[in-house]
Amino acid sequence: MSDILLELLCVSEKAANIARACRQQETLFQLLIEEKKGAEKNKKFAADFKTLADVLVQEVIKQNMENKFPGLGKKVFGEESNEFTNDLGEKITVELQSTEEETAELLSKVLNGNMPASEALAQVVHEDVDLTDPTLESLDISIPHESLGIWVDPIDSTYQYIKGSANVKSNQGIFPSGLQCVTILIGVYDLQTGLPLMGVINQPFASQNLTTLRWKGQCYWGLSYMGTNIHSLQLAISKSDSETQTENSDREFSSPFSAVISTSEKDTIKAALSRVCGGSVFPAAGAGYKSLCVIQGLADIYIFSEDTTYKWDSCAAHAILRAMGGGIVDMKECLERSPDTGLDLPQLLYHVENKGASGVELWANKGGLIAYRSRNRLDTFLSRLIQNLGPVKTQA
């Protein structure tokens, strides 16, 4: 199984290279944007966009997984269809070709004959990426490939990607908007149980060199399977743990909470959160990025009461958080159940469609979500949130 995760790290980095390449040329970037229509449209945004970068990234992930693990590429699911319409109204199916030249030829149809741009993109698509991790290479875990499914969000926070703001200031390490909020999300789940098993989050625009204006990325991963829990932040955490263990156990129950939220969150939730968290409520763009803030320890909780996140938004982060001892739960179910029932938390699952839905809504996280790293912190947070929501709690 670690061989799959190693391959996902490599394809996520190739995907990040594509995302960066598409942004570096403004004229090229304008060509790549196409508005999403019909059943594909995410109802949260007035104008949602499909970019060729989105489609290319998803196809690269599919093709690479299929080449390395035959059959697995067919079980890569995501938000994007690989059909693109050019300015002449021609529908083009975007697929990786066997050679760089053939891929460039296909891309030139999408890009209205712009061969230099097509060749530049094809080069990045066919470039080999070698990303290794000694921890993963030494891990020996076996799981049949046929029992796995993969959720992909090729470019989460497409709006921030298109807008391309590079000079947004962070608030206590959390960026409210900007390219830092863009993530590539790859989550692996069990087709039978729906549990998330492996996750990769690649942040292509983590930091910018102010001299060269080049962007550097950062990659995070986690694996949670049959009692094995391992993640990329383990070394960083274990170094500080020995010094702060007592302090952390006290903090579980005493200190204020911090939460990261969507700018579109309901006023009732915002008001309750301000009573629970005081001034430590941070708005930020992108479901993937907000989950990453919890993974990084920048916030205790990511909470979202709406039904406009999807399985591809949450699966990768959920797997990493499980490896850390946390998870992502259904917010509505959490607020409706009695805390003293002793029931397991309603973790999000990834294998069952929503009944009666169509299009992307088949895979919406209908009850909203709460992402967390610490179960103890979550329990305390939930009891305080319920107290502060009062009678409106079941409407979330």
From Swiss-Prot:
One GO term under biological process is:
phosphatidylinositol phosphate biosynthetic process
Q: Alphabetically list the UniProt keywords.
A: Hydrolase, Lithium, Magnesium, Metal-binding, Phosphoprotein
Q: Quote the record's binding site residues for 1D-myo-inositol 1,4-bisphosphate.
A: D156, S157, T158, S264, K266, G286, A287, K290, T308
Task: Quote one Gene Ontology molecular function term.
Answer: inositol-1,4-bisphosphate 1-phosphatase activity
- Gene3D superfamilies (UniProt xref): 3.40.190.80, Fructose-1,6-Bisphosphatase, subunit A, domain 1, Inositol Polyphosphate 1-phosphatase, domain 1
Modulation of this protein's activity:
Inhibited by Li(+).
Q: Which reaction does it catalyse?
A: 1D-myo-inositol 1,4-bisphosphate + H2O = 1D-myo-inositol 4-phosphate + phosphate; 1D-myo-inositol 1,3,4-trisphosphate + H2O = 1D-myo-inositol 3,4-bisphosphate + phosphate
- Per UniProt, the enzyme's principal EC class comes to hydrolase
Q: What is its EC number?
A: 3.1.3.57
Residues bearing PTM Phosphoserine: S314
Specify which residues bind Li(+) according to the UniProt entry for this protein. D54, E80
Listed Pfam families: Inositol_P
Q: In which pathway does it act?
A: Signal transduction; phosphatidylinositol signaling pathway
Cofactors: Mg(2+)
User: Where does this protein hold Mg(2+) 1?
Assistant: E79, D153, I155
PANTHER family listed in its UniProt record: 3'(2'),5'-BISPHOSPHATE NUCLEOTIDASE 1, INOSITOL POLYPHOSPHATE 1-PHOSPHATASE
* Family, per entry: Belongs to the inositol monophosphatase superfamily.
Self-association state and partner proteins as the record states:
Monomer.
**Role according to the record:** Mg(2+)-dependent phosphatase that catalyzes the hydrolysis of the 1-position phosphate from inositol 1,4-bisphosphate and inositol 1,3,4-trisphosphate and participates in inositol phosphate metabolism.
Instruction: Tell me the protein's name.
Output: Inositol polyphosphate 1-phosphatase
